[in-house]
Amino acid sequence: MPYTPIDIQKEEADFQKEVAEIKKWWSEPRWRKTKRIYSAEDIAKKRGTLKINHPSSQQADKLFKLLETHDADKTVSFTFGALDPIHVAQMAKYLDSIYVSGWQCSSTASTSNEPSPDLADYPMDTVPNKVEHLWFAQLFHDRKQREERLTLSKEERAKTPYIDFLRPIIADADTGHGGITAIIKLTKMFIERGAAGIHIEDQAPGTKKCGHMAGKVLVPVQEHINRLVAIRASADIFGSNLLAVARTDSEAATLITSTIDHRDHYFIIGATNPEAGDLAALMAEAESKGIYGNELAAIESEWTKKAGLKLFHEAVIDEIKNGNYSNKDALIKKFTDKVNPLSHTSHKEAKKLAKELTGKDIYFNWDVARAREGYYRYQGGTQCAVMRGRAFAPYADLIWMESALPDYAQAKEFADGVKAAVPDQWLAYNLSPSFNWNKAMPADEQETYIKRLGKLGYVWQFITLAGLHTTALAVDDFSNQYSQIGMKAYGQTVQQPEIEKGVEVVKHQKWSGATYIDGLLKMVSGGVTSTAAMGQGVTEDQFKESKAKA
């Protein structure tokens, strides 16, 4: 027969059973804060007939419970960006989660092998591949430890420290590396490769910048919500409890792709001088005349001075203050009560209200002020981030505002603003190495900063690039000393401290799993092998005597 026979009744029964299972799954407490705009039937139809249970979903459950506990206790899961298996194995002793940074991957682990700054222009499998690299290392060290422990007696095991190597991983999904279908595929990759959670930011994909670079271009609020819905839908299709972190770069953004979403209208800049003309047309005309470089920049600068660039509410307030109106303060209050960062008032509504209050059509044109690339000028800020955080909250497990400084007052303003609308919302915070920490606060405040943020609801905090910076510092220091004092640098500043501090990598053969692999060889060869890696003659026997010679 050209086709495979199928029992239609069983097919229908299996579908209805799966729909019921999905509905039951979604009714669990895990999803009490999650909004879905699609049905269980939609998800069941998009699944294959073979059910695959991804271990990363167990890690997601572990992460969710971890953050739930921290939230209840007003404590914090704090971590940093891991570069490699050495990092995750050492971090596991002290930290309860792992971060995988797109910035670090861009500079050190692109699948194209081409280093780059954090522009998310590396292949989209770059960060998922790094997650898998670290996840496989976690699984291996977990197996290795278990085998080692189970060769000991129960009494010996009770005295032997246990390390939870399976710390859940949260990874950087940048802007999603494309449209909705790209985000669905990227999410699938992360699920398959071991991520417990991912974060996605509200920048435009083609112009994405590191959160601490200039020139950031936002997408409209709804477009980013669509990304978050895509992540959840993808996770639902593949049966994962993956956590989604919604990041907003709106605090320092200066451009936006579109004016389509009324929630963004308050923050879009326009020209208030009708004599200024259209900037893009002016620049194009200048270029057609062969004007480039500094002369072209001067034309743009002159236009900017002339245009009277401001937000619409600023233009209205200026009109009232400078015009011939009685009860100016009352007029301004009437306007700002209805038009403010969190009111979601459309420009059309704001313009209508302004005319009712002033009797004038106040000139304001955001089209003529567009940048040469076609983007609209945008003035973000903390309240803009609050607006976006509130909008993203129903579709994300955590909300993160990227900020320019480690400013506690600003962090509190954001937390209070989001939680005023969503009281139980979890928050995330980037303890960025781009901040000058010693300039920002004294050492005693640095020590308490994580805890203080934790009290505000920032349950997950991370130093994005600590893996990069600590590695650079250690290698720079060792290379310098090695160049001057040879093997004394290794013996005295690396190996001896490893021994004294009990860093297990000093016995790197054992750490890498040689004893575990010997056990596998013996198991499949009847208990005897002459090719055991850790047999007689292995040089690590030297470390049984760990005292350094004078």
UniProtKB/Swiss-Prot annotation:
InterPro entries: ICL/PEPM, Isocitrate_lyase, Isocitrate_lyase_ph_CS, Pyrv/PenolPyrv_kinase-like_dom, Pyrv_kinase-like_dom_sf. The keyword Metal-binding applies. GO terms for molecular function: isocitrate lyase activity; metal ion binding; methylisocitrate lyase activity. It is found in: Glyoxysome. Substrate binds at S101, G102, W103, G211, H212, R247, N430, L431, S432, P433, S434, T464. The active site is at C210. It comes from the Eukaryota. It catalyses: D-threo-isocitrate = glyoxylate + succinate; (2S,3R)-3-hydroxybutane-1,2,3-tricarboxylate = pyruvate + succinate. It is an enzyme of class 4 (lyase). Pathway: Carbohydrate metabolism; glyoxylate cycle; (S)-malate from isocitrate: step 1/2. Homotetramer. This is Isocitrate lyase. It comes from Candida albicans.
